[in-house]
């Protein structure tokens, strides 16, 4: 359980097509996140699943 996101680790996450932070949501905790941002990105919610570095999104480029 991540203190910044009240859903279990590995929980259900969804991200809209282009993956812009404002449109990405953790479906189970309803907090904004960006699943394709690299670990440590301050602009994105902590505790959310992230894709590989080759799939960076514009919000954290």
From Swiss-Prot:
Where does this protein hold a divalent metal cation 2? 7, 15, 26
Q: Which Pfam families match?
A: Metallothio
What are the recorded Gene Ontology BP terms? cellular response to cadmium ion; cellular response to copper ion; cellular response to zinc ion; detoxification of copper ion; intracellular zinc ion homeostasis
Which Gene3D superfamilies does the protein's record reference? Metallothionein Isoform II (4.10.10.10)
Record-annotated residues binding a divalent metal cation 5? Answer: 34, 36-37
The residues listed in the UniProt record as binding a divalent metal cation 6, with positions renumbered to this chain, are 37, 41, 44, 60
- Any idea which UniProt keywords this protein has? Acetylation, Metal-binding, Metal-thiolate cluster
Q: Please list where the region (Beta) is annotated.
A: 1-29
Could you say which residues bind a divalent metal cation 4 here?
33-34, 44, 48
Q: Which residues carry this modification: N-acetylmethionine?
A: 1
- SUPFAM superfamilies from the xrefs? Metallothionein (SSF57868)
| Gene Ontology MF terms in the entry | metal ion binding
Positions annotated to bind a divalent metal cation 3: 15, 19, 24, 29
Which InterPro entries did the record assign? Metalthion_dom_sf, Metalthion_dom_sf_vert, Metalthion_vert, TNFR/NGFR_Cys_rich_reg
The entry's a divalent metal cation 1-binding residues are 5, 7, 21, 24
Q: What are the GO cellular component annotations?
A: cytoplasm; nucleus
Question: Which annotated residues bind a divalent metal cation 7?
Answer: 57, 59-60
Residue ranges of the region described as Alpha = 30-61
Q: What PANTHER family has UniProt attached to this entry?
A: METALLOTHIONEIN, METALLOTHIONEIN 1H-LIKE PROTEIN 1
* Its job: Metallothioneins have a high content of cysteine residues that bind various heavy metals; these proteins are transcriptionally regulated by both heavy metals and glucocorticoids.
Task: Quote the entry's note on domains.
Answer: Class I metallothioneins contain 2 metal-binding domains: four divalent ions are chelated within cluster A of the alpha domain and are coordinated via cysteinyl thiolate bridges to 11 cysteine ligands. Cluster B, the corresponding region within the beta domain, can ligate three divalent ions to 9 cysteines.
Regarding protein family, the annotation reads: Belongs to the metallothionein superfamily. Type 1 family.
Provide the protein name.
Metallothionein 1H-like protein 1
* Organism of provenance: Homo sapiens (Human)
Identify the gene encoding this protein. Answer: MT1HL1
């Amino acid at each position: 359980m991540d203190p910044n996101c009240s859903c279990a680790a590995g929980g259900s996450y969804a991200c809209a097509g282009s993956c812009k932070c404002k449109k990405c949501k953790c479906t189970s905790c309803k907090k904004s996140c960006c699943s394709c941002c690299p670990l440590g990105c301050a602009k994105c919610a902590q505790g959310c699943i992230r894709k590989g570095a080759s799939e960076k999104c514009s919000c954290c480029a």
